[in-house]
Amino acid sequence: MKPITLVSGAAGLLLVTGCAGGSSSNADADLTVAASFYPLQYVAEAVGGDNVDVIPLAAPGVEPHDLELSPSAVRELSSADLVLYLSEFQPAVDDALVSTQSRAFDAADAVELRPAEEHDHEHEDGEEDHDHGQLDPHFWLDPTLLAEYATAVGQQFAQLDPDNSATYIQNATDLRAELTALDETFTSGLEQCERRDIVTSHEAFAYLADRYNLEQVGIAGIDPETEPSPAKLLEIRDLVEETGTTTIFTESLVNTSVADAIAKDTGATTAVLDPIESVVDDDDYATVMARNLDSLRQALACA
């Protein structure tokens, strides 16, 4: 793990459309930490407890890739003690960090990101292209990697606030234990299944698939807005028919039209598999992961 990166910081941030929600301000906190999207916020809140005021940059239910920051929001970045972010995942955050030169911690310094799978796609002008050299950001869908990140965040908080270091380290240890238990539940729940192929809206589930011995087939690549090529669509339809796939997985924040069409053409059904980039209402990481496991077990006919 690399040391704290002095690239930027963030406080309560406003989206172009308004204030990011999801966490109330804690005026008595010892640290103010901004989290650029939900999984990082989840870890920060669990590890920081009452000692940390966690400010979410992205509003609940909003696609974090599309985050935009107003000039006033960028100005407020510099007032936080630390910003938690993932480089190259949200360009607006990267730009704000460069301009403010405040303290930040990149999740890529805590966990090893895997290369994105190469994926044929088409631009709006119809030209076909490929993904090259891109890293897959969705590490949090493997609970063991999120546990590694939690440990690193605990160390970061302890460095910034030594008086509460024991609390941060203990909270990180407790969260790691919870995530380890979740991993064990997934392992046992997906151990004996009739099928192991999952067709997803975009390639967000490679970490989960690798961890639990599944095969991901993404309709789109790492970028959920990318249109799949005709060849890719034909490949997916053939795979669905050849493997007896019964479910095409969709996402609440991604357009479902292509997935719906594939399901209609092949006689499959659709179900939500959530990449947990954002949450709404009373959901949190654990509750959404539990629903994901239920959806996978039903789709894959697991014992």
Regions found by a protein language model. Give the residues of each.
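Extracytoplasmic metal-acquisition and chelation regions
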Residues: 2-12, 16-303
